[in-house]
Amino acid sequence: MKELLLYIARSLVDHPDQVSVTELEGEETVLELRVAPEDMGKVIGKSGRIAKSIRAVVSAAASKSDKKVIVEIDN
């Protein structure tokens, strides 16, 4: 899931070298996405639409392997 999130985020931003994902395992897997401050709007989108879409795609991919994944976006 981490690789999928990296791929999606890097394709959206102007500074793909500053994209990082930290994976925290537990009952649920938490993926913390960090991007450059100037790219934050591109990852969140208007009214959070892009962020919602990213979460939906990652959750759908995770559900295929019976996992629960939460995507958090940090700056």
For every predicted segment, state its role.
Residues 1-40, 46, 53, 57-75:
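RNA-contacting regions in translation and RNA-metabolism proteins
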